[in-house]
């Protein structure tokens, strides 16, 4: 496709839809600067193992729903700086990409998105997912957004604002390995939103103050930062907010350093929660690694200086 001129194309909907035997695809020469629609573009490209769309522009993009649906063999997806900042519908964008082990969304803007239904549904090999670039202020539906992400262990939703959401049904359903969901202390689901089975099957989930998964509480009732027995929840305070007071500052960095180098805090009843919030880095590709070191303290200090606090 190296000679294909797409400079005036406005729609690429269904372009490779149902190319079920396609094993390789080079779209590096595509000019997508005028393209408004990419819905179902690579849908059911079941044998593709890698795809590079890092050259794609999302400047004009309005719809990207089911763009990579059921690319079942896809192990590597390079999005580069591709960002659907103007797109409103991201429904099922990566649904069924069950072989993806990682996905770099660090430059992925969602400022206009209103629908994230099933966005990562069935991405059963994803172990980590960095969504810190996401803006969800306008999102009304996250139904089954992470459903079946059974390898996912930690999820940082610190940037998520679901105050406009009307449907969060099955949002984390069957995320059986999910241990920790980080969120801003202000995180809340609007009263009246549909939330049936929001946490159903999240059998490994533990809130920041130790509240363990209970099959009797799987709706939005526990979709809040865990405050223990008085206000149980399945979420943990924002990563780096070590003392859990809703602010990220130099005090948190100092506590993290003390945890790393002394035994000063180990007798406190909230030590486990503090340890979890201090463990912000160290794993391959970023994220918590089960240890607190001086590097965690330095990372928290840097975040505080940059004003990234809750």
Give, region by region, the residue ranges found by the protein language model.
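Cellulosome-associated attachment modules in secreted, modular CAZymes
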Residues: 235-310
